């Protein structure tokens, strides 16, 4: 039995059980793809496969039941189990923001090379080529890692409200890392690239790959930045990381709707940044890794403005969070795959382009930091710490010597308020894989212009 055969049976199946619950949703998926992982001279993963499965979500009197399965014949049993669970725990009112049911097929087509037309041997040869570039950069490179993945996903969604959706899309990603060692010093360089357009976006990346290894080797001999508070200029890639990790997660309404104190902090109308600051999230802009037609609750993709002219004006919702807060759903309920229920997730998150010429961002900075790209980061509520991939000192308004081990830390609200200039450049970074609630690696897009921020705490050697 295939998805097309099952699709026509879903409305009737839901109809048989509709009287037993307030809301029923069935989501079925089939995916096929390739996974390759090389570590130094070892092949860790080399596989092609097809996966299929489904999930049932049921809400009754505010209680949710969830069940997943990987054999189609288990669907009815899992539906009954989810209904029983929801009826067991439900003791309140079911509040789901209303939406119009849709019957539609949405296909996000490839615009470049189809990965299915590329043999597994050729995909591995591409990984071998990039791995050789990393390893051949310097004899100081001790470990390399190349990872390739492509997948085509087809999803069916049927609900007790009459929605019957079919969506199909591709996602491709490559990750590169090189570790350099010299005596007791160890440095790492990383790059990631992703696409929903085609296999060609993963080809001809020699300069990008070599750059990761070269940064690791170069950093071995660089001085460590002196840790203190600086004015900092960050490039668009770091801006994208900052807006996603530090601010975007705080805009997800499932962080707010049962936390009155934090809901007060994130109250609409509160000023967080300068009048030039505009922040958005949305799956509606086409061609990005966080783009789609409908979310996993059947809500149409949209663009939500989160900050307008420096003030908080919106947040990201599922139907439940929107219903409980009396707001409109935004199309941000997503799940990684059928094993997990949809939760509020970002899609494509960006800061709007400003008006300050990039060349003017360093003007007037006597001593500061210019940071670009990223190595990693973490957030804890409103606090964040990010590691820059590369950094230079700014002296007397000019770029000066490169430095290493630059970490940027702070409170997101104070940092937004300390934005001094928003540049007129812009870049979309398609390397993102977001993690939340155990659902790690969800494809997202991040974007933004270069920013100038005052009073950023920069870690390094003690002053």
UniProtKB/Swiss-Prot annotation:
EC number(s) on file: 3.4.-.-
SUPFAM superfamilies: Putative modulator of DNA gyrase, PmbA/TldD
Keyword list, A-Z: Hydrolase, Metalloprotease, Protease
GO biological process: proteolysis
Domain of life: Bacteria
Coiled coil: none
A molecular-function term among this protein's GO annotations: metallopeptidase activity
CC per GO annotation: cytosol
Pfam families: PmbA_TldD_1st (PF01523), PmbA_TldD_2nd (PF19290), PmbA_TldD_3rd (PF19289)
Record family assignment: Belongs to the peptidase U62 family.
Protein task: Probable metalloprotease.
Name of the featured protein: Metalloprotease slr0863
